[in-house]
Each structure stands twice: as C-alpha cells, then as structure tokens.
Regions:
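Intrinsic disorder/low-complexity segments
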Residues: 2-4
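Intrinsically disordered, low-complexity segments enriched in glycine/proline and serine/threonine
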Residues: 7-8, 212
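Nucleotide and nucleotide-moiety/phosphate-recognizing core
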Residues: 8-145, 151-158, 166-185, 202-207
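An accessory alpha-helical subdomain
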Residues: 160-162, 188-189
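Short glycine-rich, low-complexity/disordered patches
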Residues: 161-164, 212
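Short, basic/aromatic-enriched C-terminal tail that caps enzymatic domains
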Residues: 187-212
C-alpha cells in the first residue's frame, strides 16, 4: 500500500524504540529480533512504517545490537524509560514531525497512522486515547518542539510522558476515530510476554487465512 505524500508536510521520520529490557520474555531474549511469521519483529515494524516514511528511520537502542541498520542511536540518559528513548530519537531526527513506535508492535495499521499524520496541523503531539483514558505514547507523533519540555523534565528526573502534556499543544485521537481505521485496536498490541508472542502468531495466521 502506497500512501500519497502530503505536499504541505515535510518528510516524516519514524523512530523505533528498541532499547528496553526484555526480561519478561526470558533471560537473554532480544524481543526486537524475535521471529514472527519468518521475519523478526523489528523488520515487521519497519515494513509497516516504510509506506509513510520511506527510509527515514531511526532505531533507538544499543548500536552494537543492530549493526545491520542504517541509523541507530543510543539513549542519551542512563535511566531507561520510554521518554528517554523518545527524546533520544527526536534529538537525532532532522524531521519536524516524527512517528514514534515500539519495536514489538507488529500490527501497526498504516491507515490509522496516516490519519494521525493528517491531524498534525499546528499540534506538537498527536496521541491515541482509548478505553478509560488510556494513552499510547509509543504509537504517536511528536514534533521537535517537544524536545525542550522533555529535556527540562529529564534533567529533573521526571520520566513520565504525561508530564509533558501541559506545556504542549496535544491532539488526542479518540477511540471512535481510531476504530474507523483499526476496529480491533491491533495497532497497540505489543509483545511483553511469551503468551503475547503466541497470540501474535494466532493473529498472523488468522490474517493469512482471511486473505486467501
């Protein structure tokens, strides 16, 4: 699927966070490289993002773990947290706006991401909100203007993504909007446990069957 380029929007970059520990998957497991349907998770995620960003991709994680990828940057703060990863990726990006996702989200819906891009306008952050107000910071679009607020919080050891919201112009994508493009909310499915991997395999098998 090729998404038409928005002539008014400068090129976006996708930032994939791959620096988190995978302890819940078992000792020594790098979940970014887990095999799902014959491909490793991070490559599946990249394939979902490329129709939107082409080769404008940044992986945030230990560079020595991902030598085969073009641009890999480490976390810029020693404290491991999603906010640190997001900040590190934004700092390395030349794009005004950036799609940020986790490396373990194999069912990202391109149409939903495209809708989010269309809602950037003059916002600093576009983020899904569903259920009882649950936010998905690792399937969101961040503008470079977020950097100043993030850095101010990080140097104060404030690692909550929500803590940056009061200082930014935020567009929440509500559940009703999300379900127009992703009725099952599969874009937000991520893999933390072995059971999640089993479920992901079943989802992938089901999709293969339905496409026959």
């Amino acid at each position: 699927m090729i998404v038409e380029e928005n002539k008014e929007m400068p090129p976006l970059t996708a930032i994939i966070l791959a620096g988190g520990r995978s302890n819940r998957m078992g000792a020594g497991k790098d979940k970014a490289k887990l095999n799902l349907g014959g491909k490793c998770l991070i490559d599946i995620v990249i394939s979902r993002l490329q129709p939107l960003v082409g080769d404008n991709l940044i992986i945030v994680g230990p560079p020595e773990k991902y030598p085969a990828y073009k641009q890999v940057v480490p976390d810029l703060f020693s404290k491991g947290s999603p906010l640190v990863g997001i900040y590190s990726g934004l700092k390395a990006s030349f794009s005004l706006y950036n799609i940020v996702v986790g490396c373990d989200m194999p069912f990202l819906e391109v149409k939903l991401l495209q809708y989010m891009i269309e809602n950037i306008n003059s916002n600093d952050l576009v983020i899904p909100r569903y259920g009882a107000g649950y936010l998905e910071p690792l399937c969101a679009i961040y503008g470079k203007r977020c950097l100043e607020v993030m850095e101010r919080n990080l140097v104060k050891d404030i690692f909550s993504v929500r803590a940056i919201f009061p200082y930014l112009k935020v567009r929440f994508i509500e559940e009703e909007e999300i379900k127009k493009y992703d009725p099952g909310l599969y874009s937000f499915f991520n893999i933390n446990y072995k059971q999640d991997m089993i479920r992901a395999e079943k989802i992938m098998d089901s999709r293969r069957e339905s496409s026959k």
